[in-house]
Curated annotation (Swiss-Prot):
Pfam families: FAD_binding_4, MurB_C. Residues 33-197 form the FAD-binding PCMH-type domain. It is an enzyme of class 1 (oxidoreductase). Its EC number is 1.3.1.98. GO terms for cellular component: cytosol. SUPFAM superfamilies: FAD-binding/transporter-associated domain-like, Uridine diphospho-N-Acetylenolpyruvylglucosamine reductase, MurB, C-terminal domain. Its main location: cytoplasm. It is found in: Cytoplasm. It comes from Bacillus anthracis. This is UDP-N-acetylenolpyruvoylglucosamine reductase 2. One of its GO terms (molecular function) is FAD binding. Belongs to the MurB family. Keywords: Cell cycle, Cell division, Cell shape, Cell wall biogenesis/degradation, Cytoplasm, FAD, Flavoprotein, NADP, Oxidoreductase, Peptidoglycan synthesis. The gene is murB2.
Length: 305
């Protein structure tokens, strides 16, 4: 299928300005890397997502979904087919102690909405930069909390565009993983069950976690957060630091001097710089400590020709 035809058709389905050709994906990731998307769309509701999926299925066009790009490296060759950004699907409703949040809502914003309603349970998420969909996809967590602790169910869309409601058990949550890495479901919304709390106590906890994050993490540079999962009975940052890798740079990307578990884009780095540095760090740590670090960050897209 000719991508010009795809662009022209989808432009009749989505609002003006929400369909683009050859969009640079570095503009849609936190680390500011990534090549072009053949066709980039940003739906505003579930019906538009369904329309994109059905059209793509009809003509066998590959589809890639993006949240807010906080935990993904898109290769320098970009993404073929249709790239769907979910950042405009952001509704949040509160009923009693239940919050229902759509996939594109920032999990930080949801934690603040919980605070505004004196609800406790999402304080840990006050510094997680991802979207609700991304948080469920990888069972995001911090400071002893995880999304799986407060999620009760979620609405998903199948690869055929069908809506389904899944209970928490169906997610098969583990450490920084869920069933979504191995199926074609698209997370549309999540239902969180929280508890009534005291505003001042919730805010104090969030302020404390925010201070810890800002004092320990290199927020002044583009990054994708923690690059590696925590190995059993150890910490990735500690192993990287003890391997003498802080400040190690490949191209424009370096292992952060502030937090060894982060890799930061300090000088117009590329996706390949990140990938090469990740492999170098994995190789060095394994040679020194016998520990193979597992990536937390996702890598998608095509290599640059």
């Amino acid at each position: 299928m000719n991508m010009q035809e795809v662009y022209e058709y989808l432009s009749t389905v989505l609002p003006e300005g929400h369909v683009k050709q050859d969009e640079m994906l570095k503009n849609h990731t936190h680390i500011k890397v990534g090549g072009k998307a053949d066709v980039f769309v940003a739906p505003t509701n579930y019906d538009e997502i369904q329309e994109v999926i059905k059209y793509a299925n009809k003509y066998n066009i590959p589809v890639t979904f993006l949240g807010n790009g906080s935990n993904v490296i898109i290769k320098d060759g970009g993404i073929r087919g249709i790239t769907v950004s979910l950042i405009h699907i952001t509704g949040v409703t509160v009923t009693g102690t239940t919050i229902v949040a759509q996939c594109g809502a920032a999990i930080i914003d949801v934690s603040r909405i919980a605070l505004d309603h004196n609800l406790t349970g999402l304080e840990f998420a006050c510094g997680i930069p991802g979207s609700v969909g991304g948080a469920l996809y990888m069972n995001a967590g911090a400071y002893g909390g995880e999304i799986s602790f407060v999620l009760t169910e979620a609405v998903v869309m199948t690869g055929d565009g069908e809506l389904r409601t899944l209970t928490k058990e169906a997610f098969e949550f583990g450490y920084r993983k869920s069933v979504f890495a191995n199926n074609h479901y698209i997370i549309l919304e999540a239902r969180f069950e929280l508890e009534e709390g005291v505003y001042e106590e919730i805010k104090a906890k969030m302020d404390d976690l925010t201070f810890k994050r800002e004092s320990k993490q290199p927020l002044e540079y583009p990054s994708c957060g923690s690059v590696f999962k925590r190995p059993p009975n150890n910490f990735a940052g500690k192993l990287i630091q003890e391997s003498g890798l802080q400040g190690k740079r490949i191209g424009g990307v370096e292992v952060s001097l502030k937090h060894a578990g982060f890799m930061v884009n300090v000088d117009n780095g590329t996706a390949q710089d990140y990938i090469d540095l990740i492999h170098f760090v994995q190789k060095t740590v394994e040679e020194k400590f016998g520990v193979k670090l597992e990536r937390e960050v996702r890598i998608i897209g095509e290599d640059k020709e």
